Amino acid sequence: ISQMPRLSSNNINQVYQRAFLNVFKSKNHNIEVIKMEGISTPAAFGLFHPVILLPNIEFTETELYCVLLHELIHIKHRDWGIKVIMDFISCIHWWNVCVSILLPSMLQQIQELYVDHSMEAIVPTQNRLDYANSILKTLRHAQSNRKQMMDQTSYYALCNLSNKKNLRQRFYYIEKWKHKKKSNTFIAFAAIL
């Protein structure tokens, strides 16, 4: 990965900076973005030196912003570390179908829905269609390159993206995005007290 070309386009770097500041609110994190051939879906990995890998897909600026936000939120939630732990547990319990097959796919869906929920607060409601389009572009790219590349990002993405029920659930949730006003949050908090 250290030999891979880094993103050099000013436009992409500006989109990345805007997405980064919306997620982390500070410049203390060092996250590299690498666009490369050979992967089918965007992916974020690494706990101490996180990296975002982007496939060779032409996204619009807003779609790219949504993709980068999505991956940065995965990094913020430390989803990659959770997946590694889940993979380890699956290896230990390889004989148990619930743990080795069902639990990882459920965890993947929960992580994706949690990221979608987190994005609701950042992405303007009018851009939810761009977010959904970026998911569809990624799915089309992953399915068209399915036979050529079966890397780990493809495996996780195809398990999650090819499941129509999961996609329907995500798109339904994205369609229902509504920005919550701070006053509503305050009222809810006051009601709890």
Where are these regions (language model features)?
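Membrane-embedded and juxtamembrane structural elements of multi-pass membrane proteins
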Residues: 1-193
